[in-house]
Amino acid sequence: MAAPSGGVNCEEFAEFQELLKVMRTIDDRIVHELNTTVPTASFAGKIDASQTCKQLYESLMEAHASRDRVIKNCIAQTSSVVKQLREEREKNLDDLTLLKQLRKEQTKLKWMQSELNVEEVVNDRSWKVFNERCRIHFKPPKNE
């Protein structure tokens, strides 16, 4: 699933996380998808497993790339805000509101960066399941 066309709201971490949750649906349902679309040996002749695996591969690649873009875009945006707040803070060391805002943005940035680790785990799990069921039906291109 691609990111919504209206853009991503990186300002609210809860909205950012909810978007990722929705975007991870394909990974959450991969076992069910494979069980219902890729035949076992006894039903091998009734469904084109290579085409099904190819389509699932392409969907996974698109979903993973899309989420990676969203996460990295939000990290870049939040990093920019943190940098700006740091510069303002250096000019006005007595402003406690500014300090509080800086800390809040730094925390949000750390959470967003941790989503990259979550993404790696989610992707690894999906590829493991995909390869277990599709390796005999479909060979992904070597360049990816």
Swiss-Prot record:
Residues carrying N-acetylalanine: A2
InterPro entries according to UniProt: MIX23
Protein's UniProt keywords contain DNA-binding: no
Pfam families xref list: MIX23
Coiled-coil region(s): 82-120
Superkingdom in the source lineage: Eukaryota
GO cellular component, one term: mitochondrion
Sites bearing N6-acetyllysine, chain numbering: K100
Keywords recorded for this protein, A-Z: Acetylation, Coiled coil
UniProt record similarity statement: Belongs to the MIX23 family.
Protein name in UniProt: Protein MIX23
Source species: Bos taurus (Bovine)
